[in-house]
Design a protein with these regions (language model features):
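Alpha-helical segment proximal to the catalytic Tyr-Lys
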Residues: 1-180
Length: 180
């Protein structure tokens, strides 16, 4: 999530409302885990400026979210990701990263920064940088199913996150509303 105007900080965003609406246990008895992250530009005036002007902090947020999934995902789980503005860019980037890398084992989380740097650099899997990053990793788990990716006002000036096409090859539904 991301809000950069002082007056809007007091009002919950759509992402906040969705996070608050999720019950800890679904009607069918399945546990539901919510991880809410306020996003870049929310911890003070300097953070607001650097996050707003340059997207500063997005990489760290992607890595934090990825680690949360590494530690909490169990086979059979489904992921629902939501984001607003730079938060939308963040969850789209996270989805692309997971599509390319899969999920590391918990014991390999130490390598997340190095692997993410390879992803961010645009190097292709199999390149020397990727081989070095994965040198001590025996393998990864497949990318978890992303059941829903809900984004509002994605920040386009930061570029399009890579690998999004691979995530949604088997999509059931896709909606895009450009009119308000």
């Amino acid at each position: 999530d991301q809000v950069d105007k002082e007056s809007q900080k007091r009002r919950p965003t759509n992402v906040t409302k969705v996070a608050r609406a999720v019950k800890p246990r679904a009607a069918n008895g399945i546990d539901q885990v919510v991880f809410y992250h306020e996003g870049v530009g929310t911890s003070g005036p300097l953070d607001s400026f650097t996050g707003g002007a340059f997207g500063s902090g997005i990489e760290a947020n992607v890595r934090d979210l990825y680690r949360f999934i590494v530690y909490n995902y169990e086979p059979g789980d489904e992921l629902y990701m939501f984001g607003f503005s730079r938060g939308a860019f963040t969850v789209r980037t996270l989805a692309g990263f997971m599509a390319l890398v899969g999920l590391l084992e918990k014991d390999d989380d130490y390598y997340v920064p190095e692997i993410y740097a390879c992803y961010e650099s645009g190097d292709k899997p199999g390149s020397p940088a990727w081989l070095k990053a994965f040198h001590n990793i025996e393998g990864t788990r497949p990318c978890p199913p992303i059941r829903f990716l809900g984004v509002w006002d994605t920040v386009g000036s930061l570029g399009a996150p890579g690998m999004l096409g691979q995530i949604f090859n088997g999509k059931k539904y896709a909606y895009h509303d450009v009119e308000l």
